[in-house]
Amino acid sequence: MVKYDAIILGSGVLGLSIASELILKGLKVAVVGKDLPEDLDSTGFASPWAGASWRSVAVNEAERRRDHYTFEQFARLAKEVPHLCEKRAYYYFWTCEDAWKEPWYKDLVFGYRMLKPEEVHAPFKYGVTYEAYTLNTPLYLLHLASTLRSAHVPIIRARLSSLDEAYSLPQLGPVDLVINATGLGARSLLGVEDPTVFPAKGQTVLVRAPVKECYGLVDPLPQPSQKAYIIPRPGPDGHVILGGCYLPNDWSTNVDPQVAEEILKQCHTLCPRLDGKGGKGTWKDIEVIAHNTGLRPVREAGLRCELEERVIGGKVRAGLATKGGKVGSGRKVSVVHAYGIGPAGYQASLGIAKELGELVDACVKKSSDNKAKL
């Protein structure tokens, strides 16, 4: 049996990106998930349902660093696989003069500038444009998985109830290092059980339209949970994602028809050409392909990206849960947590993978040093 250096729990964009980073470091890894990259219709994980565009919402230096690195890697990806990642024009419109706050990334993206009055259509008064990247998320997930499998990385379907199980899976053998990229699963996975993890429901409409640019509404909508944005997917199909909403602590994956109608109306106002009639039709003329919902994996304090040392096996005092795994005596192991990214999974994914790789380097070095002392 192959001896693996690490097991990655979770096969969403973070888990697959982390696996890709670790094999570049020469580690033998395997990916384990309840849902697999091919499960593109599953609401069990958020990754297949994203837009996804690169528009950073970073609020601190660590988040900016991750987003910046991912942006640079998307530039490479756009050259290598343009049907997955493509540089597009972005346009944002608003009516209240002070609504737009100059973003930290204005010198990172391409051609950032305020729009001239004649470039802004009614009912809006102001606008900004720049160029950044968009992804075809379902195809990107499949691309990551295919690349990993070509590198002999197994991606296995398994449902685990506890973190401890991952260190001794029958299909993979014992490991001393697990990467926890379980997303919402971190709330219920025994040994993690993070009560600050919660879902934020999103709803979008997949349409076919002759639109190549991204659009966003800056002004708040009557419902604070609702946003208006347009994200064309790279590729020849003419697919465009219209959104959306952000509903914290909503576990429902049902489509709300009223939300869907509001999305279509607001997005048609943003870009009338969505109607396929050169802007002369109405929102009802938009060619709808599918209505989608997904649950974003949010954590109150933001992303958890840290190394934790644990002890598994041995005797555990009666009545105590496995959370933390530090009670009793047994085998010393490590876990690196990478969950709680919320709506920023794609635009931060490669930066998070790089940061996590550095944590794994430190963990492996410490383990080697300890063995050398024995």
Curated annotation (Swiss-Prot):
Its cofactor is FAD. Glycans are attached at N180. Residues 1-19 form the signal peptide. GO terms for cellular component: peroxisomal matrix. It is an enzyme of class 1 (oxidoreductase). FAD binds at S11, L14, K34, D35, A46, S47, G51, R296, G342, G345, Y346, Q347. Anthranilate 1 binds at Y229, R296. GO terms for biological process: D-amino acid catabolic process; detoxification. InterPro entries: DAO, FAD-dep_OxRdtase. Pfam families: DAO. One of its GO terms (molecular function) is FAD binding. Catalyzes the oxidative deamination of D-amino acids with broad substrate specificity. Enables the organism to utilize D-amino acids as a source of nutrients. Enables the organism to utilize D-asparate and D-glutamate as a nitrogen source and may also contribute to utlization of D-tryptophan, D-tyrosine and D-asparagine as a nitrogen source. Protects the organism from the toxicity of D-amino acids, including from D-glutamate. May play a role in its interaction with the host. PANTHER family: D-AMINO ACID OXIDASE (PTHR11530), FAD DEPENDENT OXIDOREDUCTASE DOMAIN-CONTAINING PROTEIN (PTHR11530:SF30). Belongs to the DAMOX/DASOX family. This is D-amino-acid oxidase 3. It comes from Cryptococcus deuterogattii (strain R265) (Cryptococcus gattii VGII (strain R265)). The gene is DAO3.
